[in-house]
A protein has these predicted regions:
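Structural motif
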Residues: 82-83, 144, 175
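Short, conserved phosphate/pyrophosphate- and ester-handling motifs at nucleotide-, phospho-/glycolipid
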Residues: 1, 148, 210
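Conserved phosphate-binding/catalytic region of the ribokinase-like
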Residues: 105, 159-240
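Conserved beta-alpha-beta core of the PfkB/ribokinase-like small-molecule kinase fold
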Residues: 92-166, 182-184
Length: 240
């Protein structure tokens, strides 16, 4: 998004170390503001390693050494129809809940579009029941929920997108995108229920695939000037 000239701000944290320096430098060089990234003096920048299997899908290992005080940042200004994206374990971890809720409350108050990419890894599958109240609270805040079949299998033990939508999503948020790798995408809104095929391709790596998908959705919302109040009225003609 930054490379496409979109005004992007990243809210996160990193350590005061070489890994953190690389992360911040990369974001700045690619048009992403780091004004709201907390550089903590204690602890180390978290590192994740991706290992590709035979299908070039990634399995991850995470290394973390966080300080006691987390995400000590001032939240950015938010305006109506801005797009605020949250996701992954960062959006549900108890240590950051107060700060995440501060952001979500501000986004809701200002009338921004809240986009929630659940991205619930298998490494946290054993915490799914404990984290369920926070996950559902995020669903309630969200205007758009995006997740993969694997995410919902890890969270709910469900792999059927229709069942996920009807039993877990629709009550909280009517706008849902479920991705299933090469098997395509299912889109649900108040007026649309549709499956979109994925073009076949030779995958080199799936690292960052979900992030790129999210960026594409956000860019589409911006390009076609879709506002928060427009979401309930979207039809297939709008998506053609």
């Amino acid at each position: 998004l930054g490379r496409l000239g979109v005004n992007v701000t990243f809210i996160s944290e990193t350590g005061n170390d070489k890994v953190g320096d690389i992360i911040l430098k990369f974001m700045r060089e690619n048009g992403v503001s780091t004004d709201h990234v907390n550089v903590f003096p204690e602890g180390k920048s978290p590192v994740s390693l991706a290992f590709l299997n035979e299908q070039n899908d990634a399995e991850y290992l995470f290394y973390k050494d966080y300080p006691r005080l987390r995400l000590d940042v001032t939240m950015p200004e938010i305006h109506r129809d801005d797009i605020v994206m949250i996701g992954s374990y960062y959006a549900v971890t108890p240590q950051l809940r107060d700060k995440v809720k501060e952001l979500l409350d501000k986004a809701r108050e200002k009338g921004a579009i809240i986009y929630y990419d659940v991205n619930f890894r298998s490494t946290h599958k054993n915490e799914a029941i404990k984290l369920l109240p926070v996950i559902l609270e995020n669903f309630e805040y969200a205007d758009i929920i995006r997740g993969s079949v694997e995410d919902f299998e890890n969270m709910f033990g469900l792999t059927d997108a229709d069942k996920v939508y009807k039993s877990k999503i629709e009550f909280y948020c009517p706008h849902f995108i479920c991705t299933h790798g090469g098997k395509g995408i299912r889109l649900y809104t108040k007026n649309i229920k549709k499956h979109y095929e994925a073009d076949p391709l030779q995958t080199v790596s799936t690292v960052g695939a979900g992030d790129n998908f999210n960026a594409g959705v956000v860019f589409g919302l911006l390009k076609y000037r879709i506002r928060r109040d427009d979401l309930d009225e979207l039809s297939e003609d709008d998506l053609a």
